[in-house]
């Protein structure tokens, strides 16, 4: 029997329906938001895999094409590998729920979110996050929810909860935030809503406005949090008992006695590879003492070693008031950069921050190089593309090269969002822009190095960017009332810390953000401090970028295509293309240019050879030229009739050469002067209101073209 719980969410009804689908899953719900319907199932195994001391969580979000009444393309006519949107949404759900499972819960867990119906107004990712939380809430899987995801936009200075696609496009702020109920509340409230996950993009919006948008979004969540409370109270199963991977005090004390001093010495090594080599040696020496038949003890010992490492890193920062590489809390690592290092790329930069290094390369193309994405909710075309690569050698590993994983796609998407607000419009810069960031060395904040390197290679390539963007990763350590915020975190600080908060922007404001936390949530005070400290760091990095290259180059690379845009009348587009593409193929064949023709009459010609471009432009103008009264043309006789001949003076443009205009003397028969296929010089006498053209041969005789 199905049960439905409903509430108002952003002025629209939202319903959670459960009890009649996927009955063998531990938890299964449907969320209905307008005509958007998402089903999420949650299953967690009852026995843990041997040797696993972490949460093996998998989240798969999939959009079925039938959800929008479509049939998939391709030979097999079925859904294939997840697209970028599906991967990014899977990551959002994963990052939101992962920190809310109990410590020591190491049972394989899978959530599958299936979009069954989609409309153009209600975001399926908002519905999917709610369904994921609700499925876990009613299941017996241990989970510290409920959580709610909400999108916040801002149009004309007004915040909007769950804006439509049109409102998102019009706005200057687009946040996706996830909040969690925290009991008891402050200021007399029964509960607070703390931030669990955040990502967003903005048009250089100031920090205060971003914080106001987050506060607005957290308040919007309350009706749906209470809706889940009703659902759990009515239908929730008792949470299962489980055997946690625990570290007893005696084992931790024993491991600490054997390894703590050496670990502290290792964490004084500033170079990552030296530090990790020393730590590996310490771990191996401790684990060797555990015999093979004591598998459970070996696992607990490994967990104790990891806990000890985290404790040491946190103690150094919280108690000794310094970081493992000797920096102060707000200090940025040493930065160096250079541009123009790849001769044939259209722009390039090498950006170094500490031991993190990004090689960013730029390629410019035409509109035919745009990325076309076909999603269930509609198509998207991108003229700015950014790809992030994280090869194994950048962290000193050797493993097979694979296609980009979820992490690489997520980092590339974040860097693209960060740079997008300063990319010139197609009218200002009619190029397709592709940046590739190769991470050559990584010790934290590689996605932020991609932002900085990407901006540098744009400037090196002569792209007229609207501002200078930099990115910085902020960390957090929180114990009781003690809160420490770190700027430009190392990989080890990220691993031992409670937050990874990436903030990108210009000197004017924020362009993109992404926050992941490992604790139950953060409040506004921590968020405000982190953003203020991030701004200081961002401005410092911007100064370093400007010291490398102060403004975009005035000229493009000599190897970049030169794009010229010619406007023709829309009715002349067919003349440019020609029958079966004959004319456009001829232009390409004779000049070697790349040419694109839009239905609105925009003709784009691209070539690194300016003479070839000039020839192609002349051919286009000739193909689309209008007949000019008084001008002499060399035409071809297309048809002969009793009263004259029809002469093509321009491609697709014919005029009437009357028998009386053939010669100065009287002509009795048209074919005495001209026949079909003859070339003839004529003068345009008149173009009437209907576009009909009168020609004269006798007035053109003796004239030169």
Curated annotation (Swiss-Prot):
Mg(2+) binds at residues 494, 500. Its cofactor is Mg(2+). It is found in: Cytoplasm. It comes from the Bacteria. GO terms for molecular function: 3'-5'-RNA exonuclease activity; magnesium ion binding; polyribonucleotide nucleotidyltransferase activity; RNA binding. GO terms for biological process: mRNA catabolic process; RNA processing. InterPro entries: ExoRNase_PH_dom1, ExoRNase_PH_dom2, ExoRNase_PH_dom2_sf, KH_dom, KH_dom_type_1, KH_dom_type_1_sf, NA-bd_OB-fold, PNPase. Residues 630-698 form the S1 motif domain. GO terms for cellular component: cytosol. It catalyses: RNA(n+1) + phosphate = RNA(n) + a ribonucleoside 5'-diphosphate. Residues 561-620 form the KH domain. Pfam families: KH_1, PNPase, RNase_PH, RNase_PH_C, S1. Its EC number is 2.7.7.8. Keywords: Cytoplasm, Magnesium, Metal-binding, Nucleotidyltransferase, RNA-binding, Transferase. It is an enzyme of class 2 (transferase). Belongs to the polyribonucleotide nucleotidyltransferase family. NCBIfam families: polynuc_phos, PRK11824.1. Involved in mRNA degradation. Catalyzes the phosphorolysis of single-stranded polyribonucleotides processively in the 3'- to 5'-direction. This is Polyribonucleotide nucleotidyltransferase. The gene is pnp.
């Amino acid at each position: 029997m199905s049960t439905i719980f409903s509430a108002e969410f952003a002025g629209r009804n939202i319903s959670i329906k459960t009890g009649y689908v996927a009955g063998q899953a531990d938890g299964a719900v449907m969320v209905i938001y307008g005509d958007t319907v998402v089903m999420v199932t949650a299953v967690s195994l009852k026995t843990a895999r041997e040797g696993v001391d972490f949460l093996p969580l998998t989240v798969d979000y999939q959009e079925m094409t039938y959800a929008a009444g479509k049939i998939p393309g391709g030979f097999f006519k079925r859904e294939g590998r997840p697209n970028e949107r599906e991967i990014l949404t899977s990551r959002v759900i994963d990052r939101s729920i992962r920190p809310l499972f109990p410590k020591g819960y190491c049972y394989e867990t899978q959530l599958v979110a299936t979009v069954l119906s989609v409309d153009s107004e209600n975001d399926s990712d908002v519905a999917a996050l709610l369904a994921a939380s609700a499925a876990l809430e009613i299941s017996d899987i241990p989970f510290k929810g409920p959580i709610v995801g909400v999108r916040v936009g801002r149009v004309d200075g007004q915040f909007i909860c769950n804006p439509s696609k049109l409102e998102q496009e019009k706005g200057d702020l687009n946040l996706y935030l996830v909040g969690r109920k925290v009991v008891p509340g402050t200021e007399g409230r029964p509960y607070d809503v703390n931030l669990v996950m955040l990502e967003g993009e903005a048009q250089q919006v100031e920090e205060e406005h971003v914080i106001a948008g987050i506060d607005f979004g957290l308040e919007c969540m309350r009706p749906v949090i209470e809706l889940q409370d009703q659902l759990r109270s009515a239908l929730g199963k008792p949470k299962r008992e489980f055997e946690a991977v625990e570290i007893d005090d005696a084992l931790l004390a024993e491991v600490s006695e054997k390894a703590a001093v050496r670990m502290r010495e290792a964490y004084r090594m500033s170079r990552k590879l030296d530090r990790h080599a020393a730590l590996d040696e310490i771990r191996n020496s401790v684990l060797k003492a555990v015999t093979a038949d004591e598998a459970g003890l070996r696992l607990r010992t490994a967990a104790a070693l990891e806990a000890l490492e985290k404790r040491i890193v946190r103690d150094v920062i919280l108690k000794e008031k310094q970081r493992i590489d000797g920096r102060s809390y707000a200090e940025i690592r040493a930065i160096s950069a250079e541009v123009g290092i790849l001769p044939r790329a259209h722009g390039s930069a090498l950006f170094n921050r500490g031991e993190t290094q990004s090689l960013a390369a730029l390629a410019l193309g035409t509109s035919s190089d745009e990325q076309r994405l076909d999603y269930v909710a509609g198509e998207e075309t991108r003229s700015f593309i950014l790809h992030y690569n994280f090869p194994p050698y950048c962290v000193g590993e050797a493993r097979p090269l694979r296609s980009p994983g979820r992490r690489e796609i997520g980092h590339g998407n974040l860097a693209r969002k960060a740079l997008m607000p300063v990319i010139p419009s197609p009218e200002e810069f009619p190029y397709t822009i592709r940046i590739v960031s190769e991470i050559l060395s990584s010790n934290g904040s590689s996605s932020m190095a991609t932002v900085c390197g990407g901006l540098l290679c744009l400037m090196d390539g002569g792209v007229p960017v609207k501002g200078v963007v930099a990115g910085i990763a902020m960390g957090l350590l929180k114990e009781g009332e003690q809160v420490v915020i770190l700027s430009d975190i190392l990989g080890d600080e990220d691993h031992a810390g409670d937050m990874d908060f990436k903030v990108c922007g210009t000197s004017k404001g924020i362009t993109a953000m992404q926050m992941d936390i490992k604790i139950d949530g953060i409040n506004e005070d921590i968020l405000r401090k982190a953003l203020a400290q991030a701004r200081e760091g961002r401005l410092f990095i911007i100064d370093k970028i400007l010291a490398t290259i102060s403004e975009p180059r005035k000229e493009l690379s000599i190897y970049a295509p030169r794009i010229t845009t010619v406007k023709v009348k829309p009715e002349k587009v067919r003349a440019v293309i020609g029958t079966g593409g004959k004319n456009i193929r001829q232009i390409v064949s004779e000049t070697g240019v790349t040419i694109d023709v839009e239905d609105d009459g925009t003709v784009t010609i691209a070539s690194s050879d300016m003479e070839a471009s000039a020839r192609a432009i002349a051919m286009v103008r000739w193909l689309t030229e209008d007949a000019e009264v008084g001008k002499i043309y060399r035409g071809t006789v297309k048809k002969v009739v009793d009263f004259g001949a029809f002469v093509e003076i321009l491609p697709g443009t014919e005029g009437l050469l009357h028998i009386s205009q053939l010669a100065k003397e009287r002509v009795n028969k048209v074919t005495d002067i001209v026949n079909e296929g003859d070339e003839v010089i004529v003068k345009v006498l008149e173009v009437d209101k209907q576009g009909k053209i009168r020609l004269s041969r006798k007035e053109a005789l003796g004239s030169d073209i």
